Amino acid sequence: MNLIESINAAQLRTDIPDFRPGDTVRVHAKVVEGTRERIQIFEGVVIARKNSGINETYTVRKISNGVGVERIFPVHTPRVEKIEVIRHGKVRRAKLYYLRALTGKKARIAERRR
């Protein structure tokens, strides 16, 4: 292992649950406001996972007051306290960008049987 790989391996988190696109997750993100730090919960559907290793990110989409909101989180960031998987969705795509154009019942994702 070269120097860069060893530095990256030291920063990888091991407490990340197994989740895929289509899963509904609850992300507990640390938010700094002035001198205070608090936990903000962002719950939505994972619509994409990109890259690998230390650079891996995932996109979570939710509907807030009738408006679609998406946030991109790095998987291995210390700014995310924990990730809870609420339900596992059954999808046949790796990227669910088509959900942006769907509303109401059309945007629902069936639950995957375990």
UniProtKB/Swiss-Prot annotation:
Which terms are listed as keywords in the entry?
A: Ribonucleoprotein, Ribosomal protein
Where do the TM regions start and end?
Answer: none
One Pfam entry name: Ribosomal_L19
Which GO cellular component terms, listed alphabetically, does the Swiss-Prot or TrEMBL entry include? cytosolic large ribosomal subunit
Superkingdom classification of source: Bacteria
The record's listing under InterPro entries reads: Ribosomal_bL19 (IPR001857), Ribosomal_bL19_CS (IPR018257), Ribosomal_bL19_sf (IPR038657), Translation_prot_SH3-like_sf (IPR008991)
Q: Per the record's keyword annotation, is Phosphoprotein included, yes or no?
A: no
GO MF terms, alphabetically ordered: structural constituent of ribosome
Q: What is the documented function of this protein?
A: This protein is located at the 30S-50S ribosomal subunit interface and may play a role in the structure and function of the aminoacyl-tRNA binding site.
Q: Which family does it belong to?
A: Belongs to the bacterial ribosomal protein bL19 family.
The protein's name in its UniProt record = Large ribosomal subunit protein bL19
Q: Which source organism?
A: Lactococcus lactis subsp. cremoris (strain MG1363)
